[in-house]
Amino acid sequence: MTLHWSLLLFIAIALVSSVAQAAVVEHTFNVGNFSISQLCQPPLIITAVNGQLPGPTIYAREGDTVVVHLVNTSPYSMTLHWHGVLQRGTPWADGPAMVTQCPVQPGGNYTYRFNVDGQEGTLWWHAHVSFHRATVYGALVIRPRGGAKAYPFPKPDKEHVVILGEWWNATVYDMERMAFLTGIPAPHADAYTINGKPGDFYNCSAPNQTAKFEVRQNGTYLLRIINAGMNTPLFFKVAKHRLTVVGADACYTKPYKTDVVVVSPGQTVDALMVASAAVGRYYMAASPYDSAIPQGPPFSDTTATAILQYAGARRKTVRWRPPVLPRRPPVNDTATAHRFFSGMTALLRHGKPSAVPLAVDTHMYVTVGLGVSLCQPEQLLCNRSAPPVFSSSMNNASFVVPKNTSLLEAHFRREPAGVYTRDFPDTPPVVFDYTGDESDNATMQFTTKSTKVKTLRYNETVEMVLQNTRLIAKESHPMHIHGFNFFILAQGFGNYDKRRAERRFNLVDPQERNTIAVPTGGWAVIRFVADNPGMWYMHCHFDAHISLGLAMVLEVLDGPTPETSVPPPPADLPRCS
């Protein structure tokens, strides 16, 4: 009896201790306009959070509740998305405009509240309406509940958040609006940035426009690398230093040693770096990876830099010596990109096997790529006598968000009529040579505008082949799924061949991600369990492509209990104007 009560007391203390360790992490994000000068241009009005570029970093521990009060003092409609947060039980906090909520209007506010159970690593947050995420973004760092000593890798001496971005010498909202009205894609960025700063290799860069990171010789540092860029995958290197990747998209990986990290928009990488070089100054460099074949319009083939500065490197003889610059990969180095993307595997912990599901309920074969469409009625400046304008699609369905009701509200009310249809196709409408350079299926270039969703039963296991197409150009598309992580079973080039590919499936320790860079002119196979009820956006993380329709939505039906069902919307959920 004494042993019995002792055991109960121990369990009770453990439960109380566990609850006590969880905290509420609360922030107020004031989204407003302020002016900033970069690259010797006149002051530019940008939209940002709390007058910062990048915005504030949110630090939490696994199991914490995050509460963010969005106060919109900008002149634009606004939403925030918590990229990679699973949002189990909190689908109303996911953030994409007209998918899970109507935008917060100027002068309005909304409180995002969600939990980070079962997630550790680097995620991030960003605006999810128009092109505002070009300047409305920041890091979301989730540490283990047990602190740094609980990392499944050597404890770092310090951590650095490294956010890669893109910069335009223009107002991005006006740029996006003009692209829509004319049907002509928005221009490429004028510069790349590291922590909001372009660095030393742009004309007229000022000394205060280069980010700096302090290290001590032989120290170990955890770099939390985020590609918050709008449209460009980036190579990331540190001169004279090698990196050991230990995580990607807030999922631990087996240690992967490399001298170059490749991050597509939306992705994150956690990498350890030992400061083992001679005392001095070294450049971190972020340079573009252009995967398009044939290459499209000219883009900024430039390099953003930050300075890694060793303690003791302030002495004149060292300070006046220019930092060492790493050799950057060729801009079209697909081999290096593919080697990195396909080289990582999951870290299996505590002797547990991988959670990858082995039985599949639903198979989908989904083409992703560019196409064309006729001018839409709302495109008032579109040249209707010229050739068709650019579009993009998945299985030839070019996604259009609803105008008056968010998808999640229509789903919750069980009133889809007039808002969306449940007929997203499981396969392409026509089978053809998807990646052939001489593809003759010109009719498939024309896409159909629609708001189609794929409806899934609760707990259904889905295997999806993502197939790149060559109709306009082959290109690596970073495909992101809200509300889920997925396992990457295999990836390769050319047209997907089921028999050959299945022999290569990794069902033992496949990497787990929320965003996958589908190989240019190739394919990838992902698998996940639809155990999160709600309406979940799946889209290319090139904003130039999502605005053209390279998206769809997964509608996951309720499970058998209140805990496995979409809860009622919060009282302050914004209304559509």
From Swiss-Prot:
It catalyses: 4 hydroquinone + O2 = 4 benzosemiquinone + 2 H2O. Cu cation 1 binds at residues 81, 480. Its cofactor is Cu cation. CDD domains: CuRO_1_LCC_plant (cd13849), CuRO_2_LCC_plant (cd13875), CuRO_3_LCC_plant (cd13897). The keyword Repeat applies. Gene3D superfamilies: Cupredoxins - blue copper proteins. Residues 30-147, 158-313, 423-560 form the Plastocyanin-like domain. InterPro entries: Cu-oxidase-like_N, Cu-oxidase_2nd, Cu-oxidase_C, Cu-oxidase_fam, Cu_oxidase_Cu_BS, Cupredoxin, CuRO_1_LCC, CuRO_2_LCC. Residues 1-22 form the signal peptide. Glycans are attached at residues 33, 109, 169, 203, 208, 218, 332, 383, 396, 404, 441, 459. GO terms for cellular component: apoplast. It is found in: Secreted, Extracellular space, Apoplast. Cu cation 2 binds at residues 83, 126, 541. It holds the Pfam family Cu-oxidase. GO terms for biological process: lignin catabolic process. Its main location: secreted. It comes from the Eukaryota. Cu cation 3 binds at residues 128, 482, 539. SUPFAM superfamilies: Cupredoxins. PANTHER family: LACCASE-24, MULTI-COPPER OXIDASE. This is Laccase-25. It comes from Oryza sativa subsp. japonica. The lineage of its organism: Eukaryota, Viridiplantae, Streptophyta, Embryophyta, Tracheophyta.
